[in-house]
A protein has these predicted regions:
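Arginine-glycine-biased low-complexity disordered regions
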Residues: 618-676, 681, 687
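Short amphipathic alpha-helical coiled-coil/interface segments
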Residues: 23-26, 41, 45-52, 62-73, ...
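Core structural elements
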Residues: 65-70, 92, 173, 209, ...
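Substrate-binding beta-hairpin/strand module that engages nucleic acids
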Residues: 123, 259, 263, 377-378, ...
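Conserved phosphate/pyrophosphate-binding and hydrolysis machinery centered on Walker-type P-loop NTPases
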Residues: 16-19, 34-42, 55-66, 82, ...
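Conserved P-loop NTPase motor core
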Residues: 1-625, 630-642, 692
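Acidic/negatively charged segments and metal-coordination signatures
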Residues: 664, 693-932
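Structured DNA-binding interfaces in DNA transaction proteins
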Residues: 446-491, 673, 677, 686, ...
Length: 932
């Protein structure tokens, strides 16, 4: 089958031929565009924008648009996009993935398709893996876009809704996948349309597309609200778990050394000692029989497996996970008495994110910090379904071809390998494999010292904060100066990475994926010039303007720009000399301390094309990847070799085993992602329906007609259910009266007319009750209008309230269904199909409950007389008393004469965003102050 696949797949050369022709068309425009003045070049944007919004296809505008960006980049950034960058840009515009090696200039590549697609006026999102890159790229590339007459926005954590809305309204918007996803969810929770911040999802260019669309796809985005449960049980469960003894599987000694298949065929009985055991491959923990007995005794329950003790069991299991599986300074860090998640792919702290399902609370109990209340899911979506909403999606990465099947299957994205501008001249050395971690770390330190002594810069890659700090301590003991970049030292990230290629530099970094800052051999003159200006007292804003190319600036900025240019030129001389010196030493040496579970992360660490350098991994048999996923052959090989811990093994013997372990891990993670998506696809259909209906309400759809339909539906369903018997004498009219009496029909209209109703057919009963209900609703509207309420606004508000409340309950119910649905497989039933069928029934129930809640609120909710409230509010604000009853007025006057006149302090007029004093719960500007 493989040869057929190869036969049907066009060669890379054939795929690139039409792209080369388009690149030729762009090149042909360069002489003409070079002659344009800055103003004439800017005017090109207005011309192209008018043509695009007039209906001309973007494909026809591509050569001119790309040529404009290239010329602008030469003038503003001092960089001319290479031909391969233009080809990469064309691929992105076509809605495909451009695989471009590290160092090929992906940031500048994205500028061309972003500019082209922004001409339509529908917005372009450039998605980065972290806030730092969004801010950095937004500022750097913003200089180019603004020069060409485009607006640029950056979405960062901590912005106000107004700032976010302004950023999204720009032609081009930079932001992280997290921020974009959460803003989408928040937009579908607002009560007023003007509070929404995002526009439609038009075109997205995803940087490090494999990290975002594949690695992070296992974790859904969740917006949570605080739950109501006490946190005491987390602390109690933690105290209990700390008393338990971890058990191990006891294998049959007669079958020791045999493969798992042989042991299974021989019927091996596996015993587990201790109170609990951990499956590291599945990252799960389970109580043994001994552990269950201890739990029952400790918590005073008879049977832990009783359904009534499910919640207690959940607390215990989460405490076990927190203590036996989750590692401090690997999975999370503790800062400022808070447990903070470390992103396993980037090594950064995930600010504001919490583990779900009570795990975060269990970790807080373990670390003896304040245990926050367990959260409740308010809204959720997976990255897969979020990014599939874009009309056009594309991405860039250095490593995507190996995952092409997943990109095509889930996102319908093809991968195109872009040839490198410079040949790959990095030297990748064989792995050094040690039997123990201890021996490996000693060898790593010795290798660093050996290379540092020559002046060669060394970048050490680790996969956890814990290992980076261990190596840092070992280097300090040996007197080696170095920098550490991890989740605890992220503030100086740009400075540390920028100087990692300096002569003699030693840098320890956790997960280099998506660092985004160039490592220049010999040092970075731009960074050095900026650093000097900061030391001299220049403000960051002045430095940013000074390093740009805008002509409309003050004399202060022009002076700062001249100073920056002078400093950069001086440092450039130094770094050029240092560059040649470092190249002579072999360039930057990359030293990996452990193989990552993804081969792509390893390749990203290995570094850039075009720069001379070398890379090597130091690994041990005790590393998690080999220990958990290495398989039986790796364990047998390790035990048979029996070498001492300081002697490296022949890596060639183990290369295939290591690669197989990584492939197994990648395959397992792919299955997890597929599994997550299969379930979320079911939820996504329901989410789209709810959000679509919600948006229609926000955009002013006639809600009144919907309310009437709801009343009709509820009455019709109730009559059909209670009057289903062919014999009218057996109709359950009492039940019908009880049900509709809690909604929209007075019970006496049914119980007081039973004989009449039994003479009618079901359609006639429905029509009669509907007419009664609608007449009551008309009177209710008259009453509430007299009270000063807008009935259409109340309908809108009550409907949104009901939808939001029931949708949250539905999410919880779906989570519970999903947690237990896997057990259906034991009954030979497909869990996915079972989930689909049950979730459909649950969705129907939710829709019915929304109808009931909305109608009940509109008919029966106690709503204050707003006019009376307003009179009282006016009296409170002005110090007057609006009393109509003359006797009451006389009584008040008499009381006033007796007590003497007392000054009344008039309250200040409420601000537009203050709560309205009438008590409606709305902001003043949306209530009594609406007409001001």
């Amino acid at each position: 089958m493989e040869w057929i696949k190869k036969l049907l797949t066009p060669s890379p050369e054939k795929l690139l031929k039409p792209l080369y022709r388009q690149a030729d068309a762009i090149d042909a425009l360069e002489p003409t565009y070079e002659k344009l003045t800055d103003d004439q070049l800017r005017e090109k944007t207005n011309e192209l924008r008018a043509r695009a919004q007039g209906g001309e296809e973007l494909d026809k505008l591509l050569p001119e648009a790309f040529a404009v960006v290239r010329e602008g980049s030469k003038r503003v950034l001092g960089m001319r996009p290479f031909r391969v960058q233009m080809i990469g840009g064309i691929v992105l515009h076509q809605g495909r993935i451009a695989e471009m090696k590290t160092g090929e200039g992906k940031t500048l590549t994205a500028a061309m398709p972003a500019y082209l697609n922004a001409l339509s006026g529908k917005g372009v999102h450039i998605v980065t893996v972290n806030d730092y890159l969004a801010k950095f790229q937004g500022e750097e590339m913003g200089k180019l876009y603004r020069f060409l007459g485009m607006s640029v926005g950056v979405i960062l954590n901590g912005l106000t809704p107004e700032q976010r809305k302004a950023a999204y309204s720009c032609d081009i918007t930079y932001g992280t996948n997290n921020e974009l996803g959460f803003d989408y969810l928040r937009d579908n929770m607002v009560v007023y349309k003007e509070n929404m911040v995002q526009r439609e999802h038009n075109f997205a260019i995803v940087d490090e597309v494999d990290s975002i669309l594949i690695d992070e796809a296992r974790t859904p985005l969740i917006i949570s609200g605080q739950g109501e449960k006490s946190t005491d049980m987390y602390e109690k469960a933690d105290r209990f778990v700390c008393r338990l003894v971890r058990g191990e599987k006891k294998e049959d000694p007669e079958l020791a050394g045999q493969s798992s298949t042989v042991r299974r065929l021989m019927g091996e009985q596996v015993e587990i000692d201790g109170d609990y055991w951990v499956d590291e491959k599945e990252k799960s923990a389970t109580l043994t029989e001994a552990g269950v007995e201890k739990a029952e005794k400790y918590f005073g329950v008879e049977n832990l497996s009783d359904p009534e003790n499910n919640e207690l069991y959940h607390y215990i299991i989460q405490a076990l996970k927190a203590n036996a599986i989750m590692k401090r300074d690997v999975d999370y860090v503790v800062q400022d008495n808070q447990v903070m998640i470390v992103d396993e792919f980037t090594g950064r702290i995930m600010v504001g994110r919490r583990f779900s399902d009570g795990l975060h609370q269990a970790l807080e109990a373990k670390e003896h910090v304040k245990v926050e209340r367990e959260s409740r899911t308010l809204a959720t979506i997976t990255y897969q379904n979020f990014f599939r909403m874009y009309h056009k999606l594309s991405g860039m990465t250095g490593t995507a071809k190996t995952e092409e099947a997943e990109f095509q299957g889930i996102y319908a994205l093809d991968v195109v390998q872009i040839p490198t501008n410079k040949p790959m001249i990095r030297k990748d050395l064989n792995d050094m494999v040690y039997t123990t971690k201890k021996g490996k770390y000693r060898a790593v330190v010795e290798e660093i010292i050996r290379r540092h002594a020559t002046g060669q810069p060394v970048l050490v890659g680790t996969i956890s904060v814990e290992v980076s700090e261990l190596l840092s301590h070992m280097l300090e003991m040996r007197g080696v100066p170095h920098e550490v970049l991890n989740a605890k030292h992220h503030a100086r990230e740009a400075a540390i990475v920028a100087q990692a290629g300096h002569y003699g530099a030693v840098t320890i970094a956790t997960n280099m994926a998506g660092r985004g800052t160039d490592i220049l051999l010999g040092g970075n003159p731009d960074y050095m010039a900026r650093r000097t200006m900061r030391q001299e007292g220049y403000e960051d804003e002045i430095i940013e303007l000074a390093t740009g190319h805008n002509e409309d600036v003050t004399d202060v900025v022009l002076a700062a720009r001249a100073h920056y240019t002078q400093l950069r030129a001086e440092y450039k001389k130094e770094t050029d000399v240092a560059h040649d010196r470092v190249v002579a030493l072999g360039g930057l040496h990359i030293l990996g301390t452990e193989r990552h579970e993804s081969r792509r992360i390893d390749n990203q660490l290995r570094g850039r094309q075009g720069d001379p350098g070398s890379s090597q991994f130091f690994i041990s048999m005790e590393d998690d990847l080999l220990r958990i996923f290495g398989g039986e052959r790796m364990k047998m090989l390790s035990s048979r070799l029996g070498m001492d811990e300081d002697t490296p093994l022949d890596a060639k013997l183990l290369t295939s085993q290591i690669e197989n372990a990584q492939k197994r891990m990648e395959s397992r993670n792919y299955e997890i992602r597929k599994h997550v998506l299969q379930y979320d696809d079911v939820m996504n259909q329901q989410r789209e329906l709810i959000y679509k209906q919600r948006r229609q309400v926000l955009e002013g759809e006639n809600v009144h007609d919907n309310i009437v339909s709801m009343i009709e539906q509820l009455i019709g369903d109730a009559v059909a259910h209670e009057c289903s018997n062919p014999d009218p004498a057996l109709w359950q009219l009492d039940s019908l009266a009880d049900y509709l009496g809690r909604l929209c029909v007075p019970p006496t209209e049914i119980t007081g007319h039973e004989d009449e109703l039994r003479k009618l057919n079901k359609d006639q009963i429905k029509e009669r009750l509907l007419n009664i209900s609608l007449e009551l609703y008309r009177k209710r509207e008259e009453q509430l209008t007299a009270y000063g309420h807008d009935m259409r606004e109340l309908e809108r508000a009550f409907l949104l309230h009901s939808v939001d409340r029931r949708w949250m309950d539905h999410i919880d119910a779906m989570d519970q269904l999903r947690d237990g649905i896997g057990l259906r497989a034991f009954a030979q039933r497909d869990p996915i199909n079972e989930y689909k069928m049950e979730s459909y029934d649950m969705f129907e129930d939710m829709v019915r409950l929304i109808r009931e809640d909305t109608v009940r609120l509109l008919f029966l909710a106690h709503i204050e007389d707003r006019n009376a409230q307003r009179r009282r509010a006016v009296a409170a604000i002005t110090g007057t008393n609006d009393v109509k009853n003359s006797s009451a007025m006389e009584k008040a006057a008499k009381s006033s004469r007796q007590e003497g006149a007392r000054p009344v302090k008039a309250d200040k007029k409420p601000g537009r965003n203050d709560p309205c004093p009438c008590g409606s719960g709305k902001k003043y500007k949306n209530c009594c102050g609406r007409n001001e």
